[in-house]
């Protein structure tokens, strides 16, 4: 029987540790950790994601600061807000909720975030440190995936790992993290020739292509581990309802694999949890607190 890599269960276990850590250490720091979230515009999905992050912060004892800006705000005003938060001693982590309206220079805004507060790990300094395998903030989804694999003692070192997708949010940083952990990594994308053949060589296959049900059993070898990063909302057979699915056709793949992540409840919860972890690590460094959470670092 295939093993389900339950991200929801693991995230709750980690959150319990985070809650205990904050409870003990805020007596030393004299305050709880703080996370600032900047949302621009009225994208409905962004509203849901920000709400989820706010709730997660509340569960573990992180104080959240939500800045919801209208989409008619100017680039310079957002830059000024980021600079203000960079110097706010009550803010340990900061993120720009993506996507933002196209009129903004997204990468320029991210570059304004102090690397020590860049909990999404997207600032060019943090990306550069990842390339050099130096300590820095790591992207949340890749870090969550690595913790999922570790939770079931799934070996990374020496394994053939195929990553489908080359985004800055997932594919690129994940490939680098796995490489730093001595995995043998192949990064694929929409222009890869014979994608099916390449994927069938993988001991660990990670689908972050952004295409619903792209991967069926013909892409997967017997006994592989499959990680599904995708999440899509499709119409169900009942026209009035929708259903969630990933990049992987799970019902077709499960009989063949050693382990898999479900959608929902796999990678998603771990992404939010690693955001909390990054915020706490920034807080920990600021106050020289104990490093009992270091096993969560990718």
UniProtKB/Swiss-Prot annotation:
GO terms for molecular function: methenyltetrahydrofolate cyclohydrolase activity; methylenetetrahydrofolate dehydrogenase (NADP+) activity. GO terms for biological process: L-histidine biosynthetic process; methionine biosynthetic process; purine nucleotide biosynthetic process; tetrahydrofolate interconversion. It catalyses: (6R)-5,10-methylene-5,6,7,8-tetrahydrofolate + NADP(+) = (6R)-5,10-methenyltetrahydrofolate + NADPH; (6R)-5,10-methenyltetrahydrofolate + H2O = (6R)-10-formyltetrahydrofolate + H(+). Keywords: Amino-acid biosynthesis, Histidine biosynthesis, Hydrolase, Methionine biosynthesis, Multifunctional enzyme, NADP, One-carbon metabolism, Oxidoreductase, Purine biosynthesis. PROSITE patterns: THF_DHG_CYH_2. It comes from the Bacteria. NADP(+) binds at residues 165-167, 190, 231. The keyword Amino-acid biosynthesis applies. Gene3D superfamilies: Leucine Dehydrogenase, chain A, domain 1, NAD(P)-binding Rossmann-like Domain. GO terms for cellular component: cytosol. Pathway: One-carbon metabolism; tetrahydrofolate interconversion. Coiled coil: none annotated. Catalyzes the oxidation of 5,10-methylenetetrahydrofolate to 5,10-methenyltetrahydrofolate and then the hydrolysis of 5,10-methenyltetrahydrofolate to 10-formyltetrahydrofolate. PANTHER family: C-1-TETRAHYDROFOLATE SYNTHASE, CYTOPLASMIC (PTHR48099:SF5), C-1-TETRAHYDROFOLATE SYNTHASE, CYTOPLASMIC-RELATED (PTHR48099). HAMAP family: THF_DHG_CYH. Belongs to the tetrahydrofolate dehydrogenase/cyclohydrolase family. Homodimer. This is Bifunctional protein FolD. The lineage of its organism: Bacteria, Bacillati, Cyanobacteriota, Cyanophyceae, Synechococcales.
């Amino acid at each position: 029987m295939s093993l389900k890599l339950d991200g929801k269960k693991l995230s709750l276990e980690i959150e319990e540790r985070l809650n205990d850590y904050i409870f003990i250490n805020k007596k030393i720091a004299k305050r709880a950790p703080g996370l600032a979230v900047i949302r621009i515009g009225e994208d409905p999905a962004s509203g849901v994601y920000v709400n989820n992050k706010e709730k997660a912060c509340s569960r573990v004892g992180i104080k959240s600061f939500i800045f919801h800006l209208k989409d008619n705000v100017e680039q310079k005003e957002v830059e000024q807000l980021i600079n203000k938060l960079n110097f706010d001693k009550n803010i340990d982590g900061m993120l720009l909720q993506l996507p933002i309206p196209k009129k903004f220079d997204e990468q320029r805004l991210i570059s304004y975030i102090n690397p020590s507060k860049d909990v999404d790990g997207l600032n060019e300094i943090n990306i550069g440190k990842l390339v050099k395998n130096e300590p820095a903030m790591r992207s949340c989804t890749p870090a969550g995936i690595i913790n999922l694999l570790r939770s079931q003692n799934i070996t990374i070192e020496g394994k053939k790992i195929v990553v489908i997708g080359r985004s800055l949010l997932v594919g690129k940083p994940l490939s680098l993290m796995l490489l730093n952990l001595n995995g043998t990594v192949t990064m694929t994308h929409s222009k890869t020739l014979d994608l099916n053949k390449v994927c069938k060589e993988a001991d660990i296959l990670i689908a972050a292509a952004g295409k619903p049900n792209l991967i069926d059993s013909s892409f997967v070898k017997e006994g592989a581990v499959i990680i599904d990063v995708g999440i899509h909302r499709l119409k169900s057979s009942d026209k009035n309802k929708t259903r969630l699915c990933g990049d992987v056709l799970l019902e077709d793949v499960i009989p063949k694999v050693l382990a898999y992540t479900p959608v929902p409840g796999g990678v998603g919860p771990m992404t939010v949890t690693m955001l909390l972890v990054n915020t706490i690590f920034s807080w920990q460094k600021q106050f020289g607190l104990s490093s009992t959470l270091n096993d969560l670092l990718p």
